[in-house]
Amino acid sequence: MSLARKKFSEFKERDDHIADTELDDFWATLQPATIDGMIGEWKGGEFLTGHKMNGQLEKAGWFGKTFKSASDVQPLVCVDATGNKFSNVAMGKGEASLWLEDFRGEVTATMVYDGQPVHDHFKKIDDDAVMGIMNGKGVLDSGRYYYFYLERV
């Protein structure tokens, strides 16, 4: 198991709040994600930091994200009461696309929502997991980002 995977597993298992600085330090050790590396279906989860978004996606039945191509992304794949997955375009105000964007001095794969000013930046933990930082007007919490992860299905 790589050091990145080990640290990621430790963060996932924590049930107390994780300081943004701990996640920022981990982020700095990871390699930028590529658009090709993001293609596929991913199950999502969040890091508990005390951000206003913590718990909101779970309440909506969020499963994860599906990247069919750079121009065809389902950012909010949710599960309904009968267990069926669907793209929640109402909550996401549309769907999304993937771009390469500069974030914190590195160019990395970034998902840009079609209908709202939100950008999800990704860095690679390994071939089957990425860390995400959600950034944008609608999501910043007193200047704080929302931290999450995706694991390949």
Describe the role of every protein-language-model region.
Residues 40-52, 104, 117-120, 139-140, ...:
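Soluble, non-transmembrane catalytic domains of enzymes that act on hydrophobic metabolites at membranes
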Residues 72-119, 123-128:
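Contiguous, well-ordered beta-strand patches that form the walls/edges
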Residues 136-153:
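Edge beta-strand at a domain terminus
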